[in-house]
Each structure stands twice: as C-alpha cells, then as structure tokens.
C-alpha cells in the first residue's frame, strides 16, 4: 500500500488494524471516524482528521459513510447510488430467460444469507400464484448456496401453474443487476439484490424484519418497504441469534405484499 503512494485514505471502519494500516500507507491525509469507543491517542495518531459520529444513529448507512467527507468541507448527504453492468452481462442473462419472459417480468429474490430475514416459502408461493393469475411472469433468483436453492425449489413446488422461471444460483452479481434493471418490479427481502434494485432505479417492494430500518432501508428507492414491525413485535436487532430458525418476516400478511405488488 505504501508503494502506491496514496494521497488520501478514508477509513470507514472502527477496527484497530484498519487504523494502523491507514497510518502505514504514508498518505498525507488520513480521515477516520471519531467513534466514542476509539477515543484514544493511538487512534488519533493514526489519522490526520476525525469526522463526527454524533448523528450516526439517526442516519442511513450511506449518509453515515458520506459524513467522513466533512473534514474536507464536503456535504453529500443525498448523493445517489448507482450500479453498472456491461452489455455482455445483459446478453448472457437474457439468453437464460424464456423468449416470452424477456420483457415485463417481475424479479423475486426470496433468499438471504441469513434465513431469519426470509419470508416463509408458502407465502412466497402464494404471492407468485397471485401475480401469475394477474398475468405477470416471475423470475426467481438466489445465491449459489445450497440452502438458498432448496428454498427456491420449495417455493416453485407451490406454484405448479404459475408463469415462472428460476435463475437461482446461475448469475454473477452483474448479470443479476442486468436482470433486475430490465424488470418491471423487484420483490425481495433485506439482502444485497434489494440494494442493487434501489441503485438501478427498478421499482421495488422490500420486506424487512428485525434489521435497523433507519440504517439499512433501500437508499432512495422507488417503491415501498413493508416492515414486519408494523404487524407485531420484533426483537432488538442487536440481540438476534443469526443462526436462529425463526422467520421474523412471517408477521407480514400475504395480502399486504400482494396489494403492494400488483
């Protein structure tokens, strides 16, 4: 890193090794955050300036990260997020779609790395059946993880008559971006593809459970966020066992998602 002769380092992390690495780069400007738990001379020594975190508990994660620019006199609280992909990405993903799916389809990503963020499979099946009855084609996506693909298979089994096609585990992130960008609507849970849809400007319906909604809701999204906390009590996000079998999104009624998706 020192050999790259960086002019500036922006350290968004709160870990000690990141601060030390920032110092070791030799960059003339090294900005970090003034985390209360890091108010120590060594933390200050590793950086040339520290940005305030005083308002972070009220800000979206994007705004928190952008606030590191404050020592430079820059205020970019509403900067748009964007995601790109190549024509080759779209060509590759388009070739995987049936001919009659290549326009006006809905993408549904029912999975997340953490299953406590997922909606029950039979409810996803009911949603797909309702959309299919209205004439919509649905593309199902997921990551390559075996558990995610098994979830998708279970959902498909509940939709024997639906106009449905699965690309679960078959796409790179940029190919997935191309598929989402050409969709009429994205429906998904609190996961990376939801944020991709927001960055691509695709209308979305996002299902949220016990995540910190202020921090992690889709940034500047077109569409709606359905929060499980509006339908019943949720645990504190910081107290969740991420390996739990609990499906906290099950508080969200199927009809509420169908109504916002049609």
Outline where the language-model segments fall:
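Catalytic machinery of carbohydrate-active enzymes
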Residues: 1-262
């Amino acid at each position: 890193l020192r050999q790259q002769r960086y002019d500036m380092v922006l350290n968004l992390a709160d870990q000690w090794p990141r601060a030390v690495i920032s110092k070791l780069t030799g960059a003339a400007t090294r900005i970090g955050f003034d985390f209360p738990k890091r108010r120590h001379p060594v933390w200050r020594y590793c950086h040339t300036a520290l940005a305030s975190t005083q308002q972070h508990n009220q800000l979206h994660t994007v705004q928190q990260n952008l606030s590191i620019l404050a020592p430079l006199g820059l205020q970019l609280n509403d900067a748009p997020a964007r995601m790109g992909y190549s024509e080759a990405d779209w060509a590759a993903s388009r070739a995987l779609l049936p001919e009659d799916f290549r326009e006006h389809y809905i993408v549904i990503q029912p999975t997340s790395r953490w299953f406590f963020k997922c909606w029950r499979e039979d409810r996803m099946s009911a949603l797909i059946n309702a959309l299919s009855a209205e004439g919509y084609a649905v593309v199902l996506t997921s990551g390559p993880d075996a558990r995610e693909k098994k979830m998708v298979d279970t959902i498909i089994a509940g939709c024997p008559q639906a106009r449905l096609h699965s690309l679960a585990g078959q796409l790179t992130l940029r190919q997935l971006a191309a598929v989402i960008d050409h969709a009429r609507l994205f429906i998904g849970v609190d996961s990376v593809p939801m944020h991709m849809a927001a960055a691509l400007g695709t209308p979305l319906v996002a299902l949220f459970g016990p995540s910190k909604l202020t921090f992690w809701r889709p940034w500047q999204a077109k569409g709606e966020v359905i929060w499980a906390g509006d339908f019943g009590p949720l645990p504190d996000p910081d107290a969740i066992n991420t390996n739990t079998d609990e499906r906290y999104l099950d508080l969200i009624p199927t009809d509420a998602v169908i109504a916002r998706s049609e």
